[in-house]
């Protein structure tokens, strides 16, 4: 996870790693990524995810109240934030289940962006089902990956998606490391 929480009030999350190549790219290709700034109650959820990971690694429980300032409960710009996390050791695959639900409940469109298209069977099934039902399903992925084996593996899933009506777009401006999903103007 790439999480940064500052004074319990501002959080950043996304795909950005900390190294020069993620800012300037490599000699071979530019690097594109997406990172979000979050304020308000959503920051607590980011901090919680970070502290759970911290405890898992260090066995240190960070509970001092100074790390948890009062939350500004105002909803700005009519925007709500929900942070969903998953891990290989979690009892439920929350992110995967969220993707499946979003895909199967979409009425108009779902636009997805991923650097590595390695869908689980339920996600691929939901993408195909939604596309066959007339939902505009679009997938943006990099034309070339930063890992050749992953690129080949990703390509192996594309025909099945395309045959169901998923529109696949290849990003050619370098390596796109973003992981995004938007659906029906409300998610």
What do these predicted regions represent?
Residues 1-187:
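Charged, low-complexity intrinsically disordered terminal segments
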């Amino acid at each position: 996870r790439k999480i940064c929480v500052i004074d319990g009030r501002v959080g950043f999350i996304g795909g950005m790693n900390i190294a020069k190549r993620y800012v300037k790219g490599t000699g071979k290709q530019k690097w594109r990524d997406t990172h979000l700034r979050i304020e308000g109650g959503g920051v607590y959820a980011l901090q919680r995810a970070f502290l759970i990971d911290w405890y898992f690694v260090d066995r240190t429980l960070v509970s001092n109240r100074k790390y948890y300032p009062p939350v500004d409960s105002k909803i700005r710009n009519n925007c709500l934030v929900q942070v969903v996390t998953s891990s290989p050791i979690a009892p439920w695959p929350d992110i995967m289940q969220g993707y499946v639900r979003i895909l199967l409940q979409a009425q108009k469109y779902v636009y997805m962006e991923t650097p590595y298209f390695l869908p689980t069977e339920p996600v691929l099934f939901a993408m195909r089902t939604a596309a066959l039902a007339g939902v505009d399903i679009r997938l943006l992925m990099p034309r070339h990956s930063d890992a050749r084996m992953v690129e080949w593996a990703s390509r192996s899933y594309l025909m099945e998606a395309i045959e169901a009506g998923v529109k696949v777009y290849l990003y050619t401006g370098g390596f796109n490391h973003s992981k995004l999903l938007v659906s029906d103007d409300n998610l």
